[in-house]
Amino acid sequence: MKITKIEKKKRLYTLELDNTENLYITEDTIVHFMLSKGMIINAEKLENIKKFAQLSYGKNLGLYYISFKQRTEKEVIKYLQQHDIDSKIIPQIIDNLKSENWINDKNYVQSFIQQNLNTGDKGPYVIKQKLLQKGIKSKIIESELQAINFQDLASKISQKLYKKYQNKLPLKALKDKLMQSLTTKGFDYQIVHTVIQNLEIEKDQELEEDLIYKELDKQYQKLSKKHDQYELKQRIINALMRKGYQYEDIKSALREYL
């Protein structure tokens, strides 16, 4: 077989043979086999060219995908599959990219954690789940997470949350809100307990009274038309306790309000 034409088509080249067979190849393929118009090739060499072209094209696709941002091994595999790369050669492409350090899940985890420490608000449990979803092995994630102390980040977030809610919630509800928010963000109980203690939150009696009367008035307006005096009182007590107010404080406020 003779090569009758090699023509550039965007990122690939078209290779035409005198047996009317055409195939797409990469520039690396041309260089590797020193292909040129008029060259005679046999069936075995043609097969080698096809295999190399697929590998080269797959690698170039992977590099293109990685060029936008760091990717995990699983993400690159999925991208290659979506672009119809032969599943039999994907492992070879991945091994090649890993050997040249284009894919490195350990580095990905380190960067992910560091970015979260700098600008994020997630604790180790949420981080682990996010990384597992990206196909990274649990042992790699855990190894990197164990090297990080998340208390400073938890402390910074707790201070922001405290400023947000300190004038909106009674003491118990405020502490519960901080506990729930930090736990939901993936911080472990011991760290959450420590950073909340370190805030040294104290009860502001004047603020608590102001908040409880506002809430009491709100509940009264909502419930007074539906219930008699006794039922109304019980429902208001239950509603305020659910919002974190202490029973004795509620009773005291009710005595003055009703």
From Swiss-Prot:
A Gene Ontology biological process term: regulation of DNA repair
Keyword line: Cytoplasm
Cellular-component GO terms for this entry: cytoplasm
Main location: cytoplasm
One family name in Pfam for this protein: RecX_HTH2
InterPro entries: RecX_HTH_1st (IPR053926), RecX_HTH_2nd (IPR053924), RecX_HTH_3rd (IPR053925), Regulatory_RecX (IPR003783), WH-like_DNA-bd_sf (IPR036388)
Cellular localisation: Cytoplasm
Family affiliation: Belongs to the RecX family.
Protein name: Regulatory protein RecX
Gene: recX
